[in-house]
Amino acid sequence: DRDAQTLTDERSDQGDGNFRYEFETSNGIYTQKTGTPGSEGQSNYQGSFRFTLEDGTIAEVTYIADENGFQPSSDLLPVGPPAPPHVQRLLEIAAEQRAQGITFD
């Protein structure tokens, strides 16, 4: 959109791994993100972005990125079916065994 105007463009970087930014345009594009140093040497991010789809639907994604990887969340993302009961039971057994100190290397 050539006529889109920047409504918000705020950035803060403390130089120690902590930062924040926010950006928004008049055509509905928005993003924000904060970052902090992680406990295992990684950077931890938390943020979101949104924009309007061609049909007028607002697409919004929130996310966390840390030592566990990128973890997006959105109503637009597909969700797999739940694990069947026998798989859930196996996961419970594995958790019990880990709690008892049992490992399988």
UniProtKB/Swiss-Prot annotation:
Pfam families xref list:
Chitin_bind_4 (PF00379)
Pull one GO CC term from this UniProt entry: chitin-based extracellular matrix
Look up keyword Cell membrane and say if it applies.
no
From the UniProt entry, list the residue stretches annotated as the region Disordered.
Answer: 1-21
Using the record's annotation, list all stretches that form the Chitin-binding type R&R domain. 16-81
InterPro entries, A to Z = CHIT_BIND_RR_consensus, Cuticle_Struct_Prot, Insect_cuticle
Kindly list the GO molecular function terms attached to this UniProt entry. structural constituent of chitin-based larval cuticle
Keywords associated with the record: Cuticle
What's the protein here called? Cuticle protein AMP1A
